[in-house]
Design a protein with these regions (language model features):
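Structural alpha/beta core scaffold segments of enzyme domains
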Residues: 1-291, 324, 346, 350, ...
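Substrate-binding beta-hairpin/strand module that engages nucleic acids
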Residues: 118-120, 324-342
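Glycine-rich, small/acidic residue-mixed loop/short-helix segments
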Residues: 308
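Generic long, charged, amphipathic alpha-helical segments
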Residues: 334-360
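C-terminal structured "cap/appendage" subdomains that terminate the fold
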Residues: 355-374
Length: 397
């Protein structure tokens, strides 16, 4: 079925018909759990006409509302103690753990109740990043410049979480994006960077495909399309310089580059990878450049970028949520693995100097990582990665 048009610029259909060359591709990303170190949990105390809740939440208002609804009291009779969470990343905006704790506490008024989910409870009952499927078509003119971009997005759940096409940072004169959202009985919710991790993988990966089809260096190709995005261009130039783009690499190594703006901040990353004959991907180095306005706390910026890249490496190389016979297959870190310390590459963090107001840095470094790795794999092997997580079998020599 036709999707809802979310971006319509120029005349993409006419430009595609007139293009000297067209390229098509399909991308898919799975449901994604947040993999919290601290499982979902909450404590509640129900007394005569009032409720008190202790929750490592990202939002006190939804906690207050669901506690009031569950206990049958006015919202003003709910007191929330917001605790520091052991990981959240969007999952703790959905306080279903609070509902359970309050429901139990309501049965034994005056007795505090603490409900802690098991790891399996947390992973198999997540509010997942939606599964998304993407059909793309790009048109190039005779000089290899992009003239048309068509992107059909399909996904499960809230259309707000699927993407809109506004995530595309590169200047293409004719763009058409539509979104088809299917409501299915799988709970979905925001995941660190919301739409940008999957949209970044798709839009930068496909831009890299256009560069290859045009026979152009991907850095130079992308650079030429960022004239109206000077902050992101500054990140792209800085990361290319710091990574030594174009310089010789060890035998079997290759680099990929990606850039994306999100939440008022800007980030570009270069990943250096190699692929073994068995198809195993090793990321040797990641170089990141961010534009986040005035730097207030340099070590905090570095830590946030490193953490974002660590999380992005996990969903790029390691895990996704699988449904079988109506149930989630994965349940713990044995079948939903995270990047381990011994697998983590060195990460270099560079900041574009700025005297503008500070902007966020916790989420923007997440999206460029997956396309940077996938683009590097293409440079190393000639094989395109259009699905995550990356499976070794797809790259076996």
């Amino acid at each position: 079925p036709a999707g809802r048009v979310t971006r319509d610029q120029g005349d993409a259909a006419a430009a595609m018909r007139a293009a000297a060359r067209t390229i098509r591709a399909e991308y898919m990303l799975p449901f994604m759990d947040h993999a919290l170190m601290e499982p979902m949990n909450a404590a509640a105390l129900v007394t005569d006409g009032a409720v008190e809740v202790w929750s490592p939440t990202q939002g006190s208002t939804p906690v207050q509302e669901i506690a009031a609804q569950t206990a049958g009291v006015p919202v003003g009779k709910v007191k929330v103690h917001a605790l520091m969470p052991g990981g959240a990343f969007g999952r703790r905006f959905t306080p279903d753990d609070v509902a359970i704790a309050v429901a139990v506490a309501r049965q034994i008024p005056g007795t505090p109740v603490h409900v802690v989910w098991t790891r399996e409870d947390s992973i198999r009952n997540g509010a997942y990043r939606p599964l998304t499927y993407h059909q793309l078509e790009g048109g190039l003119d005779a000089a290899g410049n992009p003239v048309a971009w068509v992107h059909h997005i399909s996904g499960a759940g809230n259309p707000f979480l699927l993407g809109s096409g506004q995530e595309l940072p590169y200047a293409v004169p004719n763009i058409l994006v539509d979104v088809y959202a299917k409501d299915i009985p799988v709970p979905t919710g925001p995941w660190r960077s919301v739409t940008y991790p999957h949209m970044g993988f798709v839009v930068d990966g496909f831009t890299d495909e256009l560069a290859a089809a045009a026979g152009k260096d991907p850095y130079q190709f992308k650079r030429a399309l960022l004239g109206k995005s000077p902050k992101l261009l500054a990140c792209l130039d800085l990361v290319a310089q710091k990574a030594g783009w174009g310089k010789p690499l060890p035998q079997g190594h290759a680099v990929g580059i990606a850039a994306l703006s999100s939440f008022g901040s800007h980030a570009a990353e270069v990943a250096e990878v190699s692929v073994s004959p068995a198809g195993e991907v090793k990321v040797h180095r990641v170089v990141a450049a961010v534009h986040v306005g005035t730097v207030v706390n340099p070590p905090m910026i570095e830590a946030q970028v490193e953490g974002a890249i660590t999380m992005a490496l996990s969903f790029t190389l390691k895990h996704g949520i699988t449904l079988r016979d109506g149930a989630v297959v994965e349940g713990n870190f044995d079948d939903y693995p995270l990047i381990r310390m011994g697998e983590m590459p060195p990460v270099e963090v560079h900041v574009v100097p700025s005297d503008e107001a500070p902007t966020g840095v916790g989420e923007p470094p997440v999206p460029p990582l997956a396309p940077a790795v996938a683009n590097a794999i293409f440079a190393a092997t000639g094989k395109r990665i259009r699905r995550l997580p990356i499976e070794a079998g797809a790259l076996r020599a």
